[in-house]
A protein has these predicted regions:
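Hydrophobic, well-ordered secondary-structure elements that form the walls
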Residues: 36, 75, 127-129, 146, ...
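Conserved C-terminal beta-signal and adjacent last beta-strands/turns
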Residues: 123-133, 142
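Detector for outer-membrane/organellar transmembrane beta-barrel domains
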Residues: 1-125
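Short regulatory "switch" loops immediately downstream of catalytic or recognition motifs
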Residues: 96-99, 130-134
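Short loop/turn motifs that connect adjacent beta-strands in outer-membrane beta-barrel proteins
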Residues: 26-33, 82, 134-144, 180
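Outer-membrane beta-barrel "beta-signal"
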Residues: 129, 165-180
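C-terminal beta-signal and adjacent terminal beta-strands/loops
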Residues: 137-160
Length: 180
């Protein structure tokens, strides 16, 4: 990713984002797959589902890229041709990046006193079951998907007297028609 800013004085700042990823899906036993994805970057937070910023801009217009990383590890087990169970664990971490404008005033991401929406990390284990009721190579498939997940979120800053993180349990059910 390329980023540019222009200052009132007609100067410009430039930054080039970089990143890397390692991913694998391995069938370690018949019908049992292990999945691994990872992503480390500077300036690529939007590629982590928009959960981290790409950059911060200081008062003089200079650009500073935000470093972030994410990963997912999990398994899928096809019990029968019509039944699949799965479990994944995923996480996102975004490093703070800010500059001090004046005493008690900062600009950027994750500074003391920033919004509690500036997440330091988000973690989520997921477990689910997929039941395929009907499947045809010509017409598609009809599936019922259930999923449970537990989400934990920790911002860089929280006001005094509030919890350091937030967490929730989520349950999903989905009737899905899969196109051929």
């Amino acid at each position: 990713s390329q980023f540019r800013t222009y200052t009132p004085a007609g100067l410009h700042a430039y930054a080039l984002g970089t990143g890397g990823s390692v991913n694998a899906v391995l069938e370690v036993a018949r019908n049992f797959r292990l999945t691994l994805t990872s992503f480390y970057n500077s300036g690529g937070g939007r590629y982590i589902l928009g959960l981290a910023p790409d950059l911060t801009v200081s008062t003089n217009g200079s650009i500073s890229l935000v470093h972030s990383m994410s990963g997912i590890g999990g398994f899928e087990y096809q019990i029968t041709p019509a039944s699949l169970v799965y479990g994944y664990y995923g996480g996102v971490y975004a490093m703070r990046n800010y500059s001090v404008v004046s005493a008690g005033s900062c600009l950027g991401f994750g500074f003391p006193g920033s919004s509690s929406a500036a997440n330091r990390f988000i973690q989520e284990p997921i477990f689910g079951y997929v039941r395929t009721f009907w499947k045809s190579p010509s017409y598609g498939a009809l599936q019922f998907i259930t999923q449970y997940s537990y989400l934990v979120r920790a911002p860089w800053y929280v006001p005094a007297g509030t919890p350091e993180n937030a967490h929730t349990h989520m349950v999903f059910a989905d009737l899905r028609f899969v196109l051929p």
